[in-house]
């Protein structure tokens, strides 16, 4: 799909050349009980009051998300007009804009429209310019058009008819909007990869499949990749990671993918993604109901790989390293048992009180490995705890960090990207829950503050660099009728790196 930007000053009224541009449809926003303004006013004048008449007739009332097509329109270059309700102007917000854009795309995708002129990006969204509107609209469209049909014998209907979108923006925002469009496409491509990886079944998306995906990203975008196999992992003495992997016939992989967009000496940001391609719980077996969704336990890894793809396509001037420890967590005669004690790469011994708390066991060795890159910051991403879902539900990703500056950057990025996160505590007092009578620490700390103690466990292996942990257990996928991976937190991570790169 092709996206282009055109500066447009609606204050010029019907003299604006934008109105005569050929298009199958022009998208206009109308507020509830409000005098027409901007693009809607100009097109109303060009069509001799058509927009005003349909509003007066009650065909559309401007309520948020309502749509109405006007056909065989004369006086402008577009043959059709799509009116989109925006709700009350005094209540118009970023969310309302997103809802309006979504409604517009859904209406358009149900037609044979090929080329669209989209004017909503110039709407008065508080604290936002048209470049933000362009990015949000493209991401909304790509979300609407995403389909996962790879595993069906007869895939659903093909690509939508819509092929080209021209965004009108304020002339002063023209350059920024072009950058925003490019970044939005790259971001959507990264999110689609993340969603595809998450939606694939565990018998397809194995550790080897993730490794091959990383190799493809490296080949397509000129990145460096190293995939360490069993013997290399053993040589590194990653006993914690290997203790999880040994219960499965699928061989573990340790993926290191490097993007260099800045000077060689510039310290990289390291992203660590949990890659449990299927989590049965191990000997501490999960309940059978809903266990199919444990294919999503590699969404941390998927989001890190998706972010790397997006960053490479954007060409950001920043160095980034992705580390993905990946394996299955399965019950077997040689699998971890409750009470086993394993030795991590760092040398700390860990009492495995619950084999279903395996994510932290593979991440801790990856966090130790990350030290060799002398990172500017390390961010790990994991579907780590059900406790985080209890605390935050499915809206906010859980953010943990002792570094206030890094946490602030990530929260700012989450707000800018519309990919919300909420900071949770990481006080030293919680560490007491991880005490073991027989090892340096236990892998669980009991039911109270389960997401916090999981982060506390990881913090013991991330003491030598600025570090943050993102618990995406509640945000990486949806259940129910809309079951599927969300692509989060690729927008948050990408925006963080955009900000770091000064792009």
From Swiss-Prot:
The active site is at residues 286, 360. Binds 2 manganese ions per subunit. PROSITE patterns: CYTOSOL_AP (PS00631). It catalyses: Release of an N-terminal amino acid, Xaa-|-Yaa-, in which Xaa is preferably Leu, but may be other amino acids including Pro although not Arg or Lys, and Yaa may be Pro. Amino acid amides and methyl esters are also readily hydrolyzed, but rates on arylamides are exceedingly low; Release of an N-terminal amino acid, preferentially leucine, but not glutamic or aspartic acids. Mn(2+) 1 binds at residues 279, 356, 358. SUPFAM superfamilies: Macro domain-like (SSF52949), Zn-dependent exopeptidases (SSF53187). Mn(2+) 2 binds at residues 274, 279, 297, 358. It comes from the Bacteria. Belongs to the peptidase M17 family. One of its GO terms (molecular function) is metalloaminopeptidase activity. Keywords: Aminopeptidase, Cytoplasm, Hydrolase, Manganese, Metal-binding, Protease. Its cofactor is Mn(2+). It holds the Pfam family Peptidase_M17_N. Disulfide bonds: none annotated. Its main location: cytoplasm. InterPro entries: Leucine_aapep/pepB, Macro_dom-like, Peptidase_M17_C, Peptidase_M17_leu_NH2_pept, Peptidase_M17_N. Its EC number is 3.4.11.1, 3.4.11.10. This is Probable cytosol aminopeptidase. Presumably involved in the processing and regular turnover of intracellular proteins. Catalyzes the removal of unsubstituted N-terminal amino acids from various peptides. Signal peptide: none annotated. PANTHER family: CYTOSOL AMINOPEPTIDASE (PTHR11963:SF23), LEUCINE AMINOPEPTIDASE-RELATED (PTHR11963). It is found in: Cytoplasm. One of its GO terms (cellular component) is cytoplasm. One of its GO terms (biological process) is proteolysis.
């Amino acid at each position: 799909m092709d996206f282009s930007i055109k500066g447009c000053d609606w204050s010029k009224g019907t003299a604006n050349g934008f109105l005569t541009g050929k298009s199958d449809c022009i998208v206009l926003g109308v507020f509830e009980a409000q005098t027409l303004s901007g693009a809607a006013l100009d097109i109303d004048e060009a069509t001799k009051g058509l927009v005003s008449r349909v509003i007066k007739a009650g065909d559309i009332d401007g309520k948020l998300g309502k749509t109405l097509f006007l056909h065989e329109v004369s006086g402008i270059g577009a043959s059709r007009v799509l009116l989109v309700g925006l709700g009350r102007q005094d209540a118009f917000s970023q969310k309302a804009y997103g809802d309006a854009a979504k409604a517009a795309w859904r209406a358009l995708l149900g037609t044979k429209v090929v080329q669209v002129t989209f004017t909503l990006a110039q709407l008065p969204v508080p604290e936002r310019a048209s470049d933000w509107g362009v990015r949000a609209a493209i991401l909304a469209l790509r979300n609407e058009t995403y389909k996962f049909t790879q595993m069906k014998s007869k895939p659903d209907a093909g690509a939508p008819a819509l092929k080209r979108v021209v965004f009108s923006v304020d002339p002063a925002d023209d350059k920024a909007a072009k950058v925003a469009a490019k970044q939005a496409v790259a971001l959507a491509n990264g999110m689609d990869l993340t969603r595809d990886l998450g939606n694939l079944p565990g018998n397809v998306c194995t550790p080897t499949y993730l490794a091959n995906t990383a190799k493809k990203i490296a080949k397509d975008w000129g990145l460096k990749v190293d995939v360490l196999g069993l013997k290399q992992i053993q040589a590194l003495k990653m006993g914690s990671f290997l203790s999880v992997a040994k219960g499965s016939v699928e061989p573990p992989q340790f993926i290191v993918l490097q993007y260099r967009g800045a000077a060689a000496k510039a310290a990289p940001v390291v992203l660590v993604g949990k890659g449990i391609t299927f989590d049965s719980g191990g000997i501490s077996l999960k309940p059978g109901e809903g266990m199919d969704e444990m294919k999503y336990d590699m969404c941390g890894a998927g989001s890190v790989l998706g972010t790397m793809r997006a960053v490479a396509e954007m060409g950001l001037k920043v160095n980034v390293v992705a580390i993905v420890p990946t394996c299955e967590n399965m019950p077997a005669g040689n699998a971890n048992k409750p009470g086993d004690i394993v030795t991590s790469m760092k040398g700390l011994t860990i009492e495995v009180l619950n084999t279903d708390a395996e994510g932290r066991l593979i991440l801790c060795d990856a966090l130790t490995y990350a030290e060799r890159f002398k990172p500017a910051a390390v961010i790990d991403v994991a579907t780590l705890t059900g406790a985080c879902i209890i605390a935050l539900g499915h809206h906010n990703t859980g953010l943990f960090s002792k570094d206030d500056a890094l946490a602030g950057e990530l929260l700012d990025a989450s707000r800018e990207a519309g990919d919300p996160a909420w900071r949770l505590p990481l006080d030293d007092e919680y560490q007491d829950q991880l005490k073991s009578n027989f090892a340096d620490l236990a892998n669980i700390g009991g039911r109270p503050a389960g997401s916090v103690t999981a982060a506390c466990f990881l913090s013991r292996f991330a003491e030598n660099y600025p570090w943050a942990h993102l618990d995406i257990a509640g945000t990486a996928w949806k259940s129910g009728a809309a079951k599927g991976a969300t692509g989060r937190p690729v927008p948050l991570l990408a925006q963080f790196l955009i900000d770091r790169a000064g792009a």
